[in-house]
Curated annotation (Swiss-Prot):
GO terms for cellular component: nucleus. This is Activating transcription factor 7-interacting protein 2. Disulfide bonds: none annotated. Its main location: nucleus.
């Protein structure tokens, strides 16, 4: 059995460790027991067994108080942890809200800056547009002036009948020259029928003439004449480029009759360059076809004293040529060129004119395309075919392949073949290898003294 003092010490110790709420309850209980105890002691004497029961009850109360205190402590810890988690969640939510607000603010600020920039650039754009419109108007004015000047240049300059040497399809001109004037001047002057050419295309070019391909140098001008002569069994090429000026010859009358005479002045000129590409070996056409000597001059000058005769025009090709052999069939274009030629048309049909030139005796050929179709591919070369009567070969012969230059083009052919009539045809070939239709066949009779 424990002594009462020891029990009291335990009770005091338990009181000290108890929370304040439980201590207050315990004090209330002690007061009630202290009040009841004197009453009982006054009336009767309490035995020891009753005291033991009282101490056991107090002990149980102390245990209950300890358990409740532990429960309260655990509840307080859980509550503190829960509040800490809530504070952390609140902090995270605040951060997210701040980020969203910042992004939205940045977006709105960028939109506002863009609107401000657009409003500020509007005036600048209007100023730039005004400058562009002014430049466009100036450019349009310049284009109009250039086009008008080109149209004026492209129009044929028709001169009066007393100052112009003009040969049409139905009329011919004879030019007479005295022996003295011919001897005193250059002997290399040759003439062709004068066809009006475009004065806007003035460009003299050097030409390279192999035995199978003839390349021309042409200057498109109303003053230009292109001469080519062909002779004997070797394809001999001599090209002379000249640049001179045509001077008008007034007080000369011109009639439409073939016997009318036109006097033109002597030609005093220095050749800029002469290219002689004569090959000593025989050409491809030395056996089966008539062979020629080709000469080309980009310009010829006519003055008021020397007379160059031109014979009458050849047949315009309206007659019947049923007795002639068929023209050669052109080869088909290469299959790999099919994709490139989809949007283009084959070459157009040229128009050919044939005339006799009296000094030196040669045949002048000129060809042109009156209306050029822009959808056609550029022409690479022109092929010249010849057929002459009293020949052993009953087929057309290609006598020259001429590099394409600005139209119209011209050439002269001089030959010594015994034939009563000559027939000519021209065919064009484009850069893709396609051949166009042949021109209308032109014929011209053998040269005779009656033409003079």
């Amino acid at each position: 059995m424990e002594s009462p003092d020891r029990k009291r010490q335990k009770v005091l110790k338990a009181k000290k460790t108890m929370p304040t709420s439980y201590q207050k309850q315990l004090e209330i209980l002690n007061k009630s027991t202290n009040v009841e105890a004197p009453k009982t002691t006054v009336g009767t004497n309490i035995p020891n067994g009753h005291n033991q029961k009282m101490f056991s009850k107090n002990k149980e109360n102390v245990k209950v108080m300890k358990v409740s205190e532990q429960i309260n402590e655990n509840a307080c810890g859980a509550l503190e942890r829960h509040t800490a988690l809530l504070e952390q969640v609140k902090h995270w939510i605040r951060q997210e809200i701040c980020m969203i607000n910042c992004n939205l603010f940045d977006k709105k600020l960028n939109e506002l800056n863009e609107r401000i920039g657009k409003t500020q650039c509007k005036s600048r754009h209007e100023a730039i547009a005004g400058e562009l419109f002014v430049k466009i108007r100036r450019l349009q004015k310049r284009i109009k002036t250039v086009l008008s000047s080109q149209r004026n240049c492209l129009e044929p300059n028709t001169l009066p009948s007393n100052t112009v040497c003009k040969v049409t399809d139905s009329e011919a001109m004879n030019l007479n020259v005295t022996q003295k004037s011919v001897k005193s001047r250059s002997k290399r002057i040759s003439s062709v029928n004068h066809t009006p050419l475009n004065s806007s295309e003035k460009a003299g070019r050097k030409t390279n003439l192999p035995s199978t391909c003839v390349e021309f140098a042409s200057e498109s001008n109303t003053d230009d004449v292109m001469l080519i002569s062909v002779k004997n069994s070797n394809l001999t090429t001599s090209i002379t480029s000249e640049q001179t000026e045509i001077r008008k010859n007034t007080s000369r009358n011109l009639s439409n009759s073939p016997n009318s005479m036109i006097k033109v002045g002597p030609v005093e000129k220095k050749f800029d360059f002469v290219i002689d590409l004569t090959r000593e070996g025989p050409s491809n056409y030395s056996i089966e076809s008539p062979s020629f000597t080709l000469k080309s001059t980009s310009k010829a000058v006519l003055r008021s004293k020397e007379i160059i005769p031109v014979a009458e025009n050849g047949n315009e090709g309206f007659g019947s040529f049923e007795h002639l052999p068929p023209l050669p069939e052109p080869p088909a274009p290469l299959p790999e060129m099919a994709d490139k030629i989809k949007d283009t048309l084959p070459p157009q049909k040229p128009e050919l004119k044939v005339k006799w030139v009296l000094r030196p005796t040669s045949i002048a050929l000129t060809w042109n395309i009156p209306k050029v179709n822009p959808n056609c591919a550029p022409v690479e070369s022109y092929h010249l075919f010849l057929y002459y009567e009293n020949s052993d070969h009953l087929t057309w012969k290609k006598i020259a392949e001429i590099k394409a230059l600005p139209l119209p083009m011209a050439c002269t052919l001089s030959q010594n073949l015994a034939s009563t009539k000559y027939y000519f045809a021209v065919q064009s070939k484009d850069i893709f290898g396609r051949y166009g239709p042949f021109c209308n066949i032109k014929s011209i009779p053998r040269f005779s003294e009656n033409l003079t």
